[in-house]
Each structure stands twice: as C-alpha cells, then as structure tokens.
Amino acid sequence: MSETKRIKTALVSVYHKEGLDEIITKLHEEGVEFLSTGGTRQFIESLGYPCKAVEDLTTYPSILGGRVKTLHPKVFGGILCRRGLEQDMQQIEKYEIPEIDLVIVDLYPFEATVASGAEEPAIIEKIDIGGISLIRAAAKNYNDVVIIASQAQYQPFRDMLMEHGATTTIEERRWFAKEAFGVSSHYDSAIFNYFDGEEGSAFRCSANSQKTLRYGENPHQKGYFYGNLDAMFDQIHGKEISYNNLLDINAAVDLIDEFKDTTFAILKHNNACGLASRPTVLEAWNDALAGDPVSAFGGVLITNAVIDKAAAEEINKIFFEVIIAPDYDVDALEILGQKKNRIILVRKPAALPKKQFLSLIHISEPTRHS
C-alpha cells in the first residue's frame, strides 16, 4: 500500500454543481490543476480558475450528442495507471498521458427521470456511461486516486481538505472508493429494476438512506432502517421511532390502505386488535376501541381521516405509542401532544410500490472454526 498522496490534477465532470464551488476554490488554493468537460468546465472558469478541456487532452470532441466525452485512453490511462508499477509509468510517459489524482463526478438522474413519468427515450438518455466508468476506474485504483462519486461525499471531502489540504491517506481513499462502489451498485440496481418492471426475474434492492434506530427487536440488538422515512411521514411530536414501532407502523399502513371509507385501526404486535369504518372519525375510533379495549393499551393507532378535536379528546384517554393520520386539526394536535414521548405522524400521500418483498427464513454464514 502507498503512503500519503498529494492531489496535483483533478478531473471534474458533474451533473449537479451545487456545493462544488467551495471544493474547487480550496483545490485551486492548493495548486491543483483542473480537467473538465462542457458545462462543468464553464462552471470552473466562471469561478475565475483555469481549466483544461478534456477535448484538448484527447484531441477528440464530445460526440454522439454528448454520449461520448471522457471515454478515451488518455483519460482512463491517467486514472488507472499504478504509480508504483514501472511498466505503467513508462507507458503513460510514452503516450503523454497525465496522471489524474482526483476524480469528482456524479451520474445522470436516472431514478428522478423515471419518477417524473418521462417517456422511455428520455429515460434511456439518463443511463450514464462515462460517469459510471470514471467512478469504477477511480475507485478500483484507490491506492493512487481519490474518487468523489456524489454530492453526499462533498462534505467529508471538504472537511478533509480543510484539515490537511490536498493530501490523502490510503484509509481516506479506500473509504471514498467504498462509497463510490455503493453509488455505482445502487445506480445499476435502479436501471435493472426499471427494465425488469413487474417480472420479478431477480431481486435487486438498494437503499442509500440509513437510519440508526434506538435498538433492534430487543435492547441488546442493533437496528437500522434503510429507506427514506421522511418521504412517507412527517413526525411532528414524540420520541425517536423504534424498530418495533416500525414493524407496527408497516402493518398499520398495509391494513388501512384496504379501506376507502373513514376508518380507524388499532394494532399491537403487528396485529389488529380493533378496526371500524364509520361516518365520522370519532365514531370509527370509539367502535375500533370497543373491539378490544385491553389490547389497545400501548398500541399503534392509524386512520385515513383528519383527526378533529372531538376524536382527539377520546383518543387521549388511553396510553398509546404511535398515532398516524393524514392530518390533524390544530386543537387535536394540542391535545394529543400533551404526552412528551407520544409519536405523532402525518402520513404523506405516496404511490404504492409496484413490488413488495417479505424476508423469510434468514440464513446466515456458518461459523468458521480454525
């Protein structure tokens, strides 16, 4: 493994430029030279810093409507060359290939384009080729190269620059490589799932957002949630959601989505212990509670109707962990928020997933004994 490396040349080619200016400024102050393409090069030059066009290095223009820009040996040779291997260094000298020590790149917004409802030709154009290749090349050669593969890595990279300038340790480069392969694998999973549609020919699941929970099913276990809870709920009151809360919330959402009329449900340990559909939310609550008033203690409550003051006054008479509704009247929130730890969630309207998965029969790696 190599020692600390200094960044001398950076290749920068990004779709999203927010937050990039601070990094470019700091790199320029450290004497780093820039290579870039199209809009990113214009962005760097607009900050007042010189930037060499990739086309000047390769002697080829961007072609095929921008589909081919960086795919060239003079780019990838500079990224993949092993600085400690004499043969590699002789070849890049022979072919006049500059060493590239830092790659900052992000990917076309494929998932956002799919979610927008765009037609397939527009979606296909958002399948990144050059960017994903740059990410993999730089991550593979983390021994010599730093790869910044998404905006999510800007902050740790900024912190690193501020701490010790344009130098990196092998541990830092390896960490960024790990993050980069996470970006590339997630991106490819999204593309596969788009083409797979509802066929279900294989299971590919990737979630970028991780939330550390208070603990797992039991206090001695760790628990994590992968996904974006904020896209599904606004938590407007209460303690942090636990692993067991999430299990009950999931069961509650699955249940309430079966009903169109005003409905209230009470769940405990993933099972409904009371449910009623009635003309008003107050009536629905009263009859749902009547189903099993004992088991309702400490449960999760959910309704598909706005909770008003009258319903809140009755609901507030029992102890419960979580309540979920599409909205609450102001007076209702004031009543329900009297208990500090009570979790109050507003459920956001969201499209149901095309596929649902259930994890069964967990098989772990066998314990190896020496």
What do these predicted ranges mean?
Residues 18-23, 30-74, 78-82, 87-97, ...:
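Feature captures the catalytic cores and cofactor-binding loops of soluble hydro-lyases/lyases
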Residues 361-370:
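Single conserved hydrophobic/aromatic residue that forms the stacking wall/gate
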